[in-house]
Amino acid sequence: LGECDVALAGGVSESIRAYGIFAGFKSQGALAAHEDPTQASRPFDRGRNGIVVSEGGCIYVLERLNDALARDAHIVAEVLGYRINSDGTDYVLPNPERQEECIRQAIENAGLSPSMIDLVSSHATSTPQGDEQECKALRNVFGDSTETLINNTKSFIGHSMGAAGAIELAGNLPSFADGYAHATINLDDLDPSCALSGLVENEAKKKAGGIETILNNSFGMLGIN
């Protein structure tokens, strides 16, 4: 845009010592409980019952492609497009129609079509209603395509709040090099309402032809997509 040469973008969250976060999710019935903590975060599974709060951080350096090439930078990805919108309906419950709109507009902004998306990094937080609503949006955009793979990083690391989007994208960037979409783990009993044709269940999957495009979903409270 001609306003800056380099920008830092990402997120950092120190959440696990913040009592209010746990109390808030608990009061909403959205905090996960499981006898085995390693299996508590289980997006799309029938037994999912809430968020596993985690923390971490990830920061990206953003610059013009020509500038990065000129300094011989190690380029991990190119930002093709983005979109942000608001559900405008409920403090907690998502609106799949607005999520779908956000996804479609992001793809359009990138100059692509849904069939050109190789991998979707889903936002699903392991909550009963949130996961189902996102799946409705994804199903409306990608239909029954098996060519667009869909996975979830929170199944491994939980929900790192404001850092989640940046961290989950980082978890999928290696796909550009090796062509593998990492799995969505802890999927022992897939909820039919969350069934997606391209869902990568429990084991990583290599995509024929490689992975060249990633759509990274981040849908926050207050309906901010």
Residue positions per predicted region:
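Stable alpha-helical structural segments in soluble proteins, enriched in small hydrophobic residues
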Residues: 102-110, 137, 141, 172, ...
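Glycine-rich phosphate/pyrophosphate-binding beta-alpha loops
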Residues: 125-127, 156-162, 218-224
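A glycine- and small-aliphatic-rich helix-loop capping segment at beta-alpha/alpha-beta transitions
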Residues: 21-35, 97-99, 133-145
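Conserved beta-strand-centric core segments of catalytic alpha/beta enzyme folds
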Residues: 1-67, 164-225
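Condensing-enzyme catalytic core mediating Claisen C-C bond formation in acyl metabolism
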Residues: 36-110, 118-119
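Short beta-alpha connecting loops at secondary-structure transitions
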Residues: 46, 87, 152-158
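Beta-strand segments within the central parallel beta-sheet cores of soluble alpha/beta enzyme folds
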Residues: 4-13, 74-82, 115-122, 148-155, ...
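Short glycine/threonine-rich loop-to-helix capping motif typified by GTGT followed
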Residues: 88-99, 125-142, 160-168, 201
